[in-house]
Structure formats: C-alpha cells, structure tokens
C-alpha cells in the first residue's frame, strides 16, 4: 500500500510577538482555495468555492460567508438534548457578517458567480480571538483560488490601555481595555471598522484605526507573497456591456425627467415617481422596438438590461447632484440632520418607553426591568456566562410599507441590535449600582435609513424613562460618502437612498464625552484617513445636536414605576449562609413559598431579594433577617409556643432559636397551670432576660 503524500505549503509571519502560520495543500484539497490559519493555538479552516456557471439576471453579488463554531475546538460539549451543534449562535452570525463586510467590495464588477466562503473554528486557545483571523483566512483562500478577487484584505484587533495601543489583545486584555476595535483593509486603505469604546475621543479613535492599518499592510504583503507562490490562475469572465439600444432610449426619453423624479419630496412619493416613470418608459420602449411581440415572449435579457440601466442612471444622477452641486434629494445640506422628535412614556404599562423619530425613520423603544432569573445565558466557545443588559432590534416589513414574513431575526436584525446594544452598554450601571436585569426592545415602526442609530437614541431615552441610572445619554448618527476619483463629499445623517447609492455607511454613537460604538462599511475598496477624520468630526457635531434634544426631553432617570419588581441587596456573614439556606434548602424554599419573592445568595454572602411590590419585599427581608440574626439580651422578639411543660413553655423566637418562658414570667398574676393560659402555636412578644450558659430565658410580663 502506497503512503499518501501531501503537498503542503507553509508560511509564517511574526505578529504582535506571536507566530501567524498559514498552510494549504493538506486539508480540504478539493476546495478552490483552502487555508489553515493558526495563531497561537487557535486554528481556523477557511475555504472558498464558486459555482460552475454565473448567475444570470442577478442584480446583486451572490456571496455567502459562514462562520462555524465547533465546541470541540475549546474542549467543550454542545448543549441541548442532541449534544450537537445546531443553528449558528448570535455570535457566529455576527462574525460571519464581520468577515463578509470587508470581503464583499473586493470582487470585480460584473462577476456574478455564486461564491461560498466557510470559516470553521477547529481549535480555540481562549487567548487568540478567531474573529479577525476569519478575515485573513477568507482573503487568502480567495487569493489562492481561481476566483477573481481584488485583495488581499487583512484584519486586526486593537485595544487601548494607559495611553498605549495593544495589537491583537486577548479576551482578558480586552476586558480591561478602553477600546475594542476591529479594523480590516487593504494595503492602500481601510474598508471596515467595528468598535466599542469607553467614551473615547475622535482623535484617539482615528489614531487607533491608523495603528491597525499599519499592521494590516504587513499581513497583506504576507498574503501577496504566499499567493504568488501557490495561487491558481483566475477564471475568465465576461462583464456585460450596456446595450446601445437601451442606453440611447433612456438617455433620450428619460434623463431630464428622472432628474426631476429623484428630487421628489418624501420617500414614498419619490419611489412612486421613479417607479411610474420607469413603467412609462418601459411601455414606450416596447412599443417602439417590439410592437408585435406578445408580453410573455419579450426577451428577458432586454427587460433586465432596461431595468439595470435605469437604476444605474438614477444612481448616477443622485450621486452627481450631491458630489458636484451639494444637492441632496430631500433638499438638505451635506451636514444637516433630518427633523427630530423625541417623546417618553408613550406606553402606559411597560417600565420605560420612548418614541424617537428622525425624518422618516422611527424607533419605538421599550425597556423592561427584571430579576437575575431574566438574565440572558450566553454559551460560547470560551465560557458560559449571563448578560444583565441586552437589546433586541425588530424590523417588520410594515416599517417600509411592504408585505413580508414575520419570523425569527435575520443576520441584519441581529447585527443592528448588537451595534445598538454595544453603544448603550458602556453607560449601563454596574450590578452593585442597579441590580436589575435590563432588556431594551427597539421596534422599527418607520424606516428610511439609520434605523440602528434611531434604536440607540430611542433606547437611551427609554432607559432613562424606566429609571435606569445611565451615566448620560447616548446618541447615534450615520455618515455617508459619495466619491468619484479624488472628488468626495461626506454626508451627515444619510437616508435610505443615500445609503443604497452611496459608497459608505459610517455609524458613530456616543455621549457628549466620547464615542461608545463605531461601525463602518464601504462599497469601494477603501477610504483614506482624511475622509475618516471629516466623517468623525461631522458625526461629533451632529451627535451633540441630537443629545441636546434628548436631554431636553429627559435629562435624569425617572422614578421606578409601581409595577417594576422591587429589589434590595443585603450582605450577611459568610458563616450565616448555611443557616439561611437550611438543610436541603428548607429555609430558603420556605421564604420563597411564603412570600412569592425570589431570593438569590452568592458565596460571598450577598443576598438579593426580588419582590413584586414594596410590602412583599419588606416581608421577605424580615424573614431573611430572622434566619441570620443573633439573639440579643434585653431585646423583644415575637415568639411562638412550640411546647408546654409544667414549669413553663418553650418558645421559638428566631428560626432554630428557642428559649424558656418560665411559669413565673408569664403574667404579673400567679399562674397555676401553664396550659390554662397558653397553647401550642400561640404567638406573642417576649423579652430576653437571661442568656447564661447558652440557655435563653424569656419573660412575657416584662415586655
């Protein structure tokens, strides 16, 4: 039997004091491109494949990026009954989006083959985070495949502590960092940014991005060297040319009218004007060029060509108006925010609510306060933990006046929710300051761009209306870009059409003190430091304006509503924990059964009591106190008769603590028989008159 020989190619790069190792030729040899990437003991397999034929008639690039977390990579078992990985976790979905975003703009125009990139985490050392490695692995897999790709693209993480930037920090280092930044880009420019920050200023953020880019350049050069040695020749593909017949007809009959249509006021009116003109021109085009051809026999490629060129012309007209005339379709200047409105307490029962409207984008944000039982369980590769604050974002079809299926959230909804949650998380109080679990839901009731940023503004207002002591308000704004050659215009507060037809979506959120979240996606191959600086400065000015409106609406946390669960925390001595819990949990279960409250006890003696109202809270705290209190001399207690003797009665004055009420201490008058005046179960107040020898003596007559 012949021994199988692998033609494995390996290359290494020193990066942040560790070795980045890439290899191909050993695993997944039937993929068009396959890379095993290792950093420390974290290992990913990145594969790139394409369909055999181009997708005809596609008006989008059919790219799919998957990121698969395998629990065996960190020596763990999956949860659930089947003990098998199921649908991707929220984190896996977000990482897949993160890899997709810098890769997508790097394919040549007109390339319409289906492309599938899969990143599988094979080993995770809990030090080297696999997220950004997926960008590097995906890029290199494409570089060595036969798929046309304008890369390479690389990515790094940057932390910031004590005035120093940290390259590719560990999760532990990120916990202590003022910044959690992922940047991706080419050798020439940055093309993706994702960040959370502890109110960092714009200049420091920009320096962090450029620090990241310096290291990205090295990784891109490394990829180029590897792909030159081991890459395949790219396939040839034909970029479709616009038919002269279609182009000439639309330019002659529709150019000036389309210029007017795109300037129609209002999203719905503008869409109707553009669509009705397209229908009119299409009908005329068919009558002039295919007068005798039945509708069902019209050439599909001609109809598609017509629609494509019409859309491209609309895009060109909108972009030129902004770039050369600084004229936006809704009449705003390039730095102007759409009309704003903010209201709180718009719903009667929810603990906190707000309605934030910016132009034709609207978020109805609702805050709910709960107990530790309401915390969200997160089970990822590193560890299992609970989140006390989380935000959910919903984008129903009615928000854009359409029909559609209502179901579980998709990638876009998860991504927008994650960004809004991250922006607000930096102002959420600690558990010691505010022991509630906090859930914010953003219902997008109208949308014309920047709905994630409306969710941040609405969420902040809703939190404050619920009484959450957030440090200060957080506002978000989305910046856009129109760029042709060296000419460019940065837009403040982009609406849907500007996002769709523009080159950049740069979302910036923060307080008046600094940035808490940042996300940048572009449709071109990269943007310069100058563009980012202008965008950050314009975003800062816009954020201050929005924060002023929000603070005028509500500037400090409101009082908790009466229907909010009541929570109080007390600390008991560690040696009293067992007494409170009782044998087999008897005591704590008894308290819960009597009151209906929830009682949580930590190993360090922190007792958290969650009750439906103030009376229940007070009753529960008294019961807790009764189990941990010590009997004190001369104190009065409410006791219960547990047994009767000839010489007196034994009474329980605290759980598990009994004393003797002697017959002579029952009443000022003489008592002949104890049972004549007392019965088992009687409850009354007694005073501790002696504690000699560990024996407790009680008196009823001295109360």
UniProtKB/Swiss-Prot annotation:
Residue span(s) of domain S1 motif: 634-701
Coiled coil (residue ranges): none
Gene Ontology CC, one term: cytosol
Protein localization: Cytoplasm
Binding of Mg(2+), residues: 499, 505
Domain KH as annotated: residue spans: 565-624
UniProt keyword list: Cytoplasm, Magnesium, Metal-binding, Nucleotidyltransferase, RNA-binding, Transferase
An individual GO BP term: RNA catabolic process
Cited SMART domains: KH, S1
EC identifiers of the protein: 2.7.7.8
Main location: cytoplasm
Domain of life, per lineage: Bacteria
Its biological purpose: Involved in mRNA degradation. Catalyzes the phosphorolysis of single-stranded polyribonucleotides processively in the 3'- to 5'-direction.
Protein name (Swiss-Prot/TrEMBL): Polyribonucleotide nucleotidyltransferase
The organism of origin for this protein: Fusobacterium nucleatum subsp. nucleatum (strain ATCC 25586 / DSM 15643 / BCRC 10681 / CIP 101130 / JCM 8532 / KCTC 2640 / LMG 13131 / VPI 4355)
